[in-house]
Amino acid sequence: HWNWKEGEDVDVWAYFNNADEVELFLNGESLGTRIPEGDAYHVMWRIPFTPGTLEAVSRKGGKEVKRTSISTASEPYALRLTPDRSEINADGTDLSYVAVEVVDKDGNLCPWAENEIFFSVEGSGFNAGTDNGSPISLEPFKSDRKKSFYGRALVIVQNDGDAGEIRVKATSPGLKESTVVINSK
């Protein structure tokens, strides 16, 4: 993520294995190009945080091979659901892990969000569990709600043995809800 305190020094690492060099840009301004030393698979910049867009451009033989960017998130606006699979077996045991993210109006992850998220699952499946990755959370695994941790949570959906659609819905007060459909076949 690219959300820190203004002026705070941040170490930015770029990992690569199919490039000769990486150039880093902050809000369109080049912060320089780095070439790996020896067998290193990363290069690093230490820069003061400035809100905006951080972009890394990898090149091999002078040609661009990859461009990756992240932007500073604004206030939490919506929930985003992303299943690891959109189709599971209708065998009563297959699972889909649905990642939940708190995002701003531009779709950027809000890394400091701690919103309480409520889940409902309808159709040919059920909520097999929830998680958020927090090592100190005392919330039960089998629950229809979970507080986001660094803007993220997880709901695990299990097929109930019948073929058909599984509709997973996530809501949180003040945020735009999200629904995703997983097919059981």
Task: Map each language-model feature to its residues.
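Long hydrophobic segments that form regular secondary structure
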Residues: 1-66, 83, 103-106
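Short aromatic-acidic-glycine turn motif
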Residues: 34-35, 77-81, 118-137
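Short, solvent-exposed loop/linker segments at the N-terminal edge
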Residues: 2-8, 87-96
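Extracellular Ig-like/FN3 beta-sandwich strand-entry sites
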Residues: 49-53, 93-95, 163-165
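Edge beta-strands of extracellular beta-sandwich domains
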Residues: 62-75, 176-185
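Short, hydrophobic beta-strand segments
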Residues: 43-49, 140-161
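Low-complexity, acidic Ser/Thr/Pro/Gly-rich terminal tails and inter-domain linkers that flank the onset
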Residues: 73-91
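Beta-strand-rich structural segments
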Residues: 12-16, 57, 82, 93-111, ...
